[in-house]
């Protein structure tokens, strides 16, 4: 291996091992998944579908893809699946290509309320090719406002309604979305990229009986390789989806990744996986309560899934400051725009925290109480320093210098905790 790359991988392994990973969209996949991704399957071109390839020598490739499809259909209890999308974004784009025409109207959640870029955000292809209308969460409860969704649907008559989010911590009523979609004759797309693991284990209701199409990533709570998938119970839609993925969106599928997806689906079908998802949710609730008890505003008052959103507007702390200084202390998270946020997306007014990765390492409730204390200690000290400066401008570097001893002390404790939960042995 190239020494430079080897050294960088070693450094990244050390970073992952020695830090607390709280980015809600990240996880630690199994060695089996990684072995499949690094296998000789990466050598094979396989444009097309099972028994309909444009290259020879695909007899074993067909079996690999067939296994992945069978396992994901069993996992989500659906009739049709496409496992070829390279990402969740491309899965969504394939749905648009299959069901929409340029200029059609789509209705989805506003980015600041927790929606995703691929749901019609202006910088994204979905916002450039389609007329995107967005609904928001309720200004008081920060919950989905189903009345507003229906009002906008009746007003704009979208061709497609999207449900599913990247920053929403409560359960989704797919049945209500189905009723709204039916009233205006719209397709319903459920993007379950974040909650796929909860849906697979029935800790969250499934959109399969309600949505025309379901998309997801295969990493995040599913703990698989980075990739996408598309599910449906409608045969005619499945044919359109297949054509949209290939030849519409992609060329040759990544067979080494599809093999890794099959392994991840197999792992998710095991009883231990349901126990894992339950622990993910317990850990998220404990972390949310600890931060609430320390005086921090958790949007919606808690969480029903794997993530929580910490609104820092009342503490005079930006998401950028929190992310940077927590990272300095060995705690990785991401700054997050809050509903009705007036700051830049590069600054933000809060952070998003997730429990899947550390739960994979073996963290339980008591460990997350400890983690929550570390987070609150850092945030408390940021607030104290900024309060002392009153209205004076202060840079993140200046805050970091003032917090040097606190950051150093916290980082030592973080590393001690992480050493008790190795990611990969041997």
UniProtKB/Swiss-Prot annotation:
<dbReference type="GO" id="GO:0004372">
    <property type="term" value="F:glycine hydroxymethyltransferase activity"/>
</dbReference>
<dbReference type="InterPro" id="IPR015422">
    <property type="entry name" value="PyrdxlP-dep_Trfase_small"/>
</dbReference>
<dbReference type="InterPro" id="IPR015421">
    <property type="entry name" value="PyrdxlP-dep_Trfase_major"/>
</dbReference>
<protein>
    <recommendedName>
        <fullName>Serine hydroxymethyltransferase</fullName>
        <ecNumber>2.1.2.1</ecNumber>
    </recommendedName>
</protein>
<keyword id="KW-0554">One-carbon metabolism</keyword>
<keyword id="KW-0663">Pyridoxal phosphate</keyword>
<dbReference type="GO" id="GO:0019264">
    <property type="term" value="P:glycine biosynthetic process from serine"/>
</dbReference>
<feature type="binding site">
    <location>
        <begin position="115"/>
        <end position="117"/>
    </location>
    <ligand>
        <name>(6S)-5,6,7,8-tetrahydrofolate</name>
    </ligand>
</feature>
<dbReference type="InterPro" id="IPR049943">
    <property type="entry name" value="Ser_HO-MeTrfase-like"/>
</dbReference>
<dbReference type="Pfam" id="PF00464">
    <property type="entry name" value="SHMT"/>
</dbReference>
<dbReference type="InterPro" id="IPR001085">
    <property type="entry name" value="Ser_HO-MeTrfase"/>
</dbReference>
<comment type="pathway">
    <text>Amino-acid biosynthesis; glycine biosynthesis; glycine from L-serine: step 1/1.</text>
</comment>
<dbReference type="InterPro" id="IPR019798">
    <property type="entry name" value="Ser_HO-MeTrfase_PLP_BS"/>
</dbReference>
<dbReference type="InterPro" id="IPR039429">
    <property type="entry name" value="SHMT-like_dom"/>
</dbReference>
<comment type="pathway">
    <text>One-carbon metabolism; tetrahydrofolate interconversion.</text>
</comment>
<feature type="modified residue" description="N6-(pyridoxal phosphate)lysine">
    <location>
        <position position="220"/>
    </location>
</feature>
<feature type="binding site">
    <location>
        <position position="111"/>
    </location>
    <ligand>
        <name>(6S)-5,6,7,8-tetrahydrofolate</name>
    </ligand>
</feature>
<comment type="similarity">
    <text>Belongs to the SHMT family.</text>
</comment>
<keyword id="KW-0963">Cytoplasm</keyword>
<comment type="function">
    <text>Catalyzes the reversible interconversion of serine and glycine with tetrahydrofolate (THF) serving as the one-carbon carrier. This reaction serves as the major source of one-carbon groups required for the biosynthesis of purines, thymidylate, methionine, and other important biomolecules. Also exhibits THF-independent aldolase activity toward beta-hydroxyamino acids, producing glycine and aldehydes, via a retro-aldol mechanism.</text>
</comment>
<feature type="site" description="Plays an important role in substrate specificity">
    <location>
        <position position="219"/>
    </location>
</feature>
<dbReference type="GO" id="GO:0005829">
    <property type="term" value="C:cytosol"/>
</dbReference>
<keyword id="KW-0028">Amino-acid biosynthesis</keyword>
<keyword id="KW-0808">Transferase</keyword>
<dbReference type="GO" id="GO:0030170">
    <property type="term" value="F:pyridoxal phosphate binding"/>
</dbReference>
<comment type="subunit">
    <text>Homodimer.</text>
</comment>
<dbReference type="InterPro" id="IPR015424">
    <property type="entry name" value="PyrdxlP-dep_Trfase"/>
</dbReference>
<dbReference type="GO" id="GO:0035999">
    <property type="term" value="P:tetrahydrofolate interconversion"/>
</dbReference>
């Amino acid at each position: 291996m190239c020494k430079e790359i080897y050294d960088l991988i070693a450094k990244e392994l050390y970073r992952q091992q020695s830090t607390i990973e709280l980015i809600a969209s990240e996880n630690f996949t199994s060695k089996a998944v990684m072995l499949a991704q690094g296998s000789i399957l990466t050598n094979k071109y396989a444009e097309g579908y099972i028994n309909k390839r444009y290259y020879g020598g695909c007899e074993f490739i067909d079996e690999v893809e067939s296994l992945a499809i069978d396992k994901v259909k069993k996992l989500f209890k659906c009739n049709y699946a496409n496992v070829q999308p390279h990402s969740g974004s491309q899965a969504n784009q394939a749905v648009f290509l299959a069901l929409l025409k340029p200029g059609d109207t789509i209705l989805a959640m506003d980015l600041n309320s927790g929606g995703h870029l691929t749901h019609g955000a202006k910088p994204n292809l979905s916002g450039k090719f389609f007329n995107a209308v967005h609904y928001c969460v309720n200004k008081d409860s920060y919950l989905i406002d189903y009345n507003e969704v229906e009002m906008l649907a009746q007003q704009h008559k979208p061709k497609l309604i999207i449900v599913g989010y990247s920053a929403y911590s409560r359960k989704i009523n797919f049945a209500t979305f189905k009723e709204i979609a039916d009233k205006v004759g719209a397709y319903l797309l459920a993007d379950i990229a974040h909650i796929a693991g909860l849906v697979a284990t029935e800790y969250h209701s499934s959109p399969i009986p309600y949505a025309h199409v379901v998309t997801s990533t295969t990493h995040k709570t599913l703990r698989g390789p980075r990739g996408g998938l598309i599910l449906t119970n409608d045969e005619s839609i499945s044919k359109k989806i297949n054509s949209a993925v290939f030849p519409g969106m992609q060329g040759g599928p990544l067979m080494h990744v599809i093999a890794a997806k099959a392994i991840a689906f197999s792992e998710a079908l095991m009883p231990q996986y349901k126990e894992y998802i339950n622990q993910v949710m317990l850990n998220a609730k404990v972390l949310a309560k600890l931060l609430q008890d320390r005086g921090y505003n958790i949007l919606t008052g808690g969480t029903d899934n794997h993530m929580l959103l910490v609104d820092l507007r009342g503490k005079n702390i930006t998401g950028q400051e929190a992310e940077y200084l927590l990272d300095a202390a060995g705690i990785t998270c991401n700054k997050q725009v809050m509903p009705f946020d007036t700051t830049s997306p590069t600054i933000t007014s809060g952070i998003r925290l997730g429990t899947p990765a550390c739960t994979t390492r073996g963290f339980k409730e008591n460990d997350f109480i400890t983690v929550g204390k570390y987070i609150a200690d850092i945030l408390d000290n940021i607030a104290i320093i900024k309060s002392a400066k009153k209205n004076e401008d202060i840079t993140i570097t200046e805050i970091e210098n003032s917090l040097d001893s606190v950051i150093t002390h916290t980082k030592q404790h973080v590393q001690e905790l992480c050493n008790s939960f190795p990611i990969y042995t041997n």
